[in-house]
Amino acid sequence: MSYSVLEALRNSPDVVRKVLTARRMDASLVDKFLELDEKWRRLKKEVDELRHEYNKLSKEGAKAPPERRREIADKARELAARLERAEKELEETERAREEVLWSFPNLIHESVPICPEGVDSIPVRHWGVVKTTKDVVDKLDKGVDYLVVEKAPVGHADMAEVVLKMADTLKAGEVAGSRFYYLFDDLVWLDFALAMYALDYLAQKGFRPVIPPYMLKYDLIRRVLDFDTFKDAIYKIDGEDLYLIATAEHGIAAYLYKRELLEEELPQLYVGWSPCFRKEAGAGSRDIKGIFRVHIFHKVEQFVFSLPEDSWKWHEEITKNTEELIRGLGLPYRVVNICAHDLGAPAAKKYDIEVWYPSQGMYRELASCSNVTDWQSYRLGIRVTRKGMKREYVHTLNCTGLATTRTITAILENFQREDGAVEIPKVLRQYLEPIKAAPKDYILPKAAKSP
């Protein structure tokens, strides 16, 4: 049983150097690890030999005649002192070695593009007809189907707050700060309908619905994400050993912490719903208007625990699931393969699914689908026992089902009418029908009510 990054470091260090270079990281980290690993292996051998010698001497002392026992006891004390020093040095070296090992990102799949400066992803496929103004046509990806319109539609922020009057970020800013919001009336029902649509669809695909804990202890949160990079992006509960999750993925991954599984127990498929809490510390002034990029949003998430040999099949499958959900809504989208330098540390490969925003004349990220291979399971100690008692780390994968809050913004832009009404995608109507107060076909502008 071996962690793939550790195995590559020991057997193919040049491969890891290439990965770090492709990710635009310092490749000298490999040499730092190999030096510590060599020291650790030398000390491990020394400790094992000293223990063997000490045990042998102890047995010899028990059988020795009285006149030799003092001599053997003196040797045993000397050996015990040497063993204690060696064990302490081994422990310190192991801790330093593990710290460096944990700082390595995942290896990358051969299909991950290595991109030049200024390019973060490569389009893979497109679906749907994008509505665009003439000035944007030349900027579209090659082969995209488009329909030229006279003027760009109203942006999602103004649609929600000015036209429909069903969101209020100004008041939320007063009471909570920027990137918070109040959502009202039909947009609330739309959020719930989107969640039910995604949960229902994925449950029918065999995914087990779950609402995970919204907080995790430090020892778990550091195992499920690249904590050193993202510690400033997630919320910590003051005075508590707890962090708010940034996605349901975190809580679901932790569910099988330290579990030993049998082959027949895999795959395990989960579809989680949760609020997601993010500081958006690096966002600056980007997307400051509306509810596109906020501190709290709702999301349905796919998560898979897989046999190692099946994970790439599952990566394509969960990406396809999300495409089908977005296609069902009728939103034009593209799938892009994320370049090596833009991959998060856990991912061996990641697709983003980006939906067309006609007011901006561009595609924007709506979902991400990653194969994390054994990067997460190594840290969480989740293994599978194979036939012949061979043990391996399972592979984990995650993929957005629907980020419902952001999906609302895409619906507001793509399905608005001249009179300010917004057509509700047909697939959502069955989830709205049982609710008497909910809209059924259209979301109509409504006069704002005074607080």
Swiss-Prot record:
<comment type="similarity">
    <text>Belongs to the class-II aminoacyl-tRNA synthetase family. Type-1 seryl-tRNA synthetase subfamily.</text>
</comment>
<keyword id="KW-0963">Cytoplasm</keyword>
<dbReference type="GO" id="GO:0004828">
    <property type="term" value="F:serine-tRNA ligase activity"/>
</dbReference>
<feature type="binding site">
    <location>
        <begin position="365"/>
        <end position="368"/>
    </location>
    <ligand>
        <name>ATP</name>
    </ligand>
</feature>
<dbReference type="Pfam" id="PF02403">
    <property type="entry name" value="Seryl_tRNA_N"/>
</dbReference>
<comment type="pathway">
    <text>Aminoacyl-tRNA biosynthesis; selenocysteinyl-tRNA(Sec) biosynthesis; L-seryl-tRNA(Sec) from L-serine and tRNA(Sec): step 1/1.</text>
</comment>
<comment type="subunit">
    <text>Homodimer. The tRNA molecule binds across the dimer.</text>
</comment>
<dbReference type="GO" id="GO:0000049">
    <property type="term" value="F:tRNA binding"/>
</dbReference>
<protein>
    <recommendedName>
        <fullName>Serine--tRNA ligase</fullName>
        <ecNumber>6.1.1.11</ecNumber>
    </recommendedName>
</protein>
<dbReference type="InterPro" id="IPR045864">
    <property type="entry name" value="aa-tRNA-synth_II/BPL/LPL"/>
</dbReference>
<dbReference type="InterPro" id="IPR042103">
    <property type="entry name" value="SerRS_1_N_sf"/>
</dbReference>
<dbReference type="InterPro" id="IPR015866">
    <property type="entry name" value="Ser-tRNA-synth_1_N"/>
</dbReference>
<dbReference type="GO" id="GO:0006434">
    <property type="term" value="P:seryl-tRNA aminoacylation"/>
</dbReference>
<dbReference type="InterPro" id="IPR002314">
    <property type="entry name" value="aa-tRNA-synt_IIb"/>
</dbReference>
<keyword id="KW-0648">Protein biosynthesis</keyword>
<dbReference type="GO" id="GO:0016260">
    <property type="term" value="P:selenocysteine biosynthetic process"/>
</dbReference>
<feature type="binding site">
    <location>
        <position position="294"/>
    </location>
    <ligand>
        <name>ATP</name>
    </ligand>
</feature>
<feature type="binding site">
    <location>
        <position position="301"/>
    </location>
    <ligand>
        <name>L-serine</name>
    </ligand>
</feature>
<dbReference type="InterPro" id="IPR006195">
    <property type="entry name" value="aa-tRNA-synth_II"/>
</dbReference>
<keyword id="KW-0030">Aminoacyl-tRNA synthetase</keyword>
<keyword id="KW-0436">Ligase</keyword>
<dbReference type="InterPro" id="IPR010978">
    <property type="entry name" value="tRNA-bd_arm"/>
</dbReference>
<feature type="binding site">
    <location>
        <position position="400"/>
    </location>
    <ligand>
        <name>L-serine</name>
    </ligand>
</feature>
<keyword id="KW-0067">ATP-binding</keyword>
<dbReference type="GO" id="GO:0005829">
    <property type="term" value="C:cytosol"/>
</dbReference>
<dbReference type="InterPro" id="IPR002317">
    <property type="entry name" value="Ser-tRNA-ligase_type_1"/>
</dbReference>
<feature type="binding site">
    <location>
        <begin position="247"/>
        <end position="249"/>
    </location>
    <ligand>
        <name>L-serine</name>
    </ligand>
</feature>
<dbReference type="GO" id="GO:0005524">
    <property type="term" value="F:ATP binding"/>
</dbReference>
<dbReference type="InterPro" id="IPR033729">
    <property type="entry name" value="SerRS_core"/>
</dbReference>
<comment type="function">
    <text>Catalyzes the attachment of serine to tRNA(Ser). Is also able to aminoacylate tRNA(Sec) with serine, to form the misacylated tRNA L-seryl-tRNA(Sec), which will be further converted into selenocysteinyl-tRNA(Sec).</text>
</comment>
<dbReference type="Pfam" id="PF00587">
    <property type="entry name" value="tRNA-synt_2b"/>
</dbReference>
<feature type="binding site">
    <location>
        <begin position="278"/>
        <end position="280"/>
    </location>
    <ligand>
        <name>ATP</name>
    </ligand>
</feature>
<keyword id="KW-0547">Nucleotide-binding</keyword>
